[in-house]
Amino acid sequence: VDLERKDLSVIYFDNGPGYYTGLRIGFSVAQGICASLGIPLVPVNGLDALAFAAHTSHRKICSLIDIKRNEFAYCTYNPVPGGVVRNTDPEVISVDNLEIKITSDTEKKLLVGNWNLLNNKKIVNDSNTKLADPKFVTAEHIFNVGERLFDSDNYPNFNEIQIEYMREPDVTLPKENLVKKVNFYD
């Protein structure tokens, strides 16, 4: 990329939910660049970015991001002129619970995000649910939401930014490894 310092005034980044390694690497790189250049870092929730990018004027929007282990991050939104408003807080949901939630809701809805990874005919064939793009969060989606957050000065302080993992990692250290004493003279 042919950029100069004067070309960069802010960085927007996807702070989750998503896969651990990608989120950590993206956050670390963004932090390093912003800290070294003294520019703001604006986190954007991936579920929000998907909903904002969805094209609907009347359907409820359901955003879905795969977070592994047959679980998804899920959140619902209402379309409003010029954007979307969250209906619910983001949650971790299994495919079985998502099926119940989607099929029992008689409201017309748009399902965006990783619905193509669902191996569930009841969800994808639900008569009140329209499967739509975007299927993945893109840099353009992050930019569109991040720009609004930045322009309205609605983002956290650099030191308060956190990644939204939404669940525990796949790999953890055994508790006994964390409580052993270290002998530096061995």
Segments from the language model and where they lie:
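Short amphipathic alpha-helical face segments that pack within enzyme cores
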Residues: 28, 49, 141-145
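Acyltransferase
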Residues: 132-186
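DPxDG-like acidic metal-binding loop motif
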Residues: 10-41
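Short, well-ordered alpha-helices that flank and scaffold nucleotide-derived cofactor binding pockets
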Residues: 31, 35, 56, 148
